[in-house]
Amino acid sequence: METQGASLSLGRWSLWLLLLGLVLPSASAQALSYREAVLRAVGQLNERSSEANLYRLLELDPAPNDEVDPGTRKPVSFTVKETVCPRTTQQPPEECDFKENGLVKQCVGTVTLDPSNDQFDINCNELQSVRFRPPIRRPPIRPPFRPPFRPPVRPPIRPPFRPPFRPPIGPFPGRR
């Protein structure tokens, strides 16, 4: 009797563990990584863009450390750069080379990690183009000439002038 009860209890536990094992991997497999969510947002930015060329992810700021539900919005910050591929191409932006002196944009906003909920709110602003200019060679700046420091010379201190002692000539009063 005890063995039947124990096997029934073991059967229930195995059923619960099996169900739990089936539910958890499917939920975690569906969630996108932070980088994948940003790449999807870049793809949608390219689709909605009216510019001639595609943009590709140039730099991704670190993900926030908080673990949240995949359906909630996560703040993102990244930089994209213009590629050589025209927007009409079917080629993924990751396979396109960056355009030399292409536009660079800083993007901030929110994305969700849930692939079924493709919501994102991203705003991109063009960064000032920073072009490399070789440094101008100028002669080194020399400080103005200053002679080495010398303390002021003081004349020696002399005692006040006293005439030399001369014994008196002649009889001295009080002496005989």
UniProtKB/Swiss-Prot annotation:
Domain comment (free text): BAC5 sequence consists almost exclusively of X-P-P-Y repeats.
Pro residues composition bias: residue spans: 141-176
Residues excised as propeptide: 30-130, 174-176
Positions of the UniProt region annotated as Disordered: 135-176
Protein name in UniProt: Cathelicidin-2
Function per UniProt: Binds to the lipid A moiety of bacterial lipipolysaccharides (LPS), a glycolipid present in the outer membrane of all Gram-negative bacteria. Potent antimicrobial activity.
Disulphide bridges: C85-C96, C107-C124
Swiss-Prot/TrEMBL GO biological process terms: antimicrobial humoral immune response mediated by antimicrobial peptide; defense response to Gram-negative bacterium; defense response to Gram-positive bacterium; innate immune response
Modified sites of kind Pyrrolidone carboxylic acid: Q30
Signal peptide extent: 1-29
A single Gene Ontology CC term: extracellular space
Entry-annotated residues carrying Proline amide: P173
Cell location: Secreted
Gene: CATHL2
GO molecular function, one term: lipopolysaccharide binding
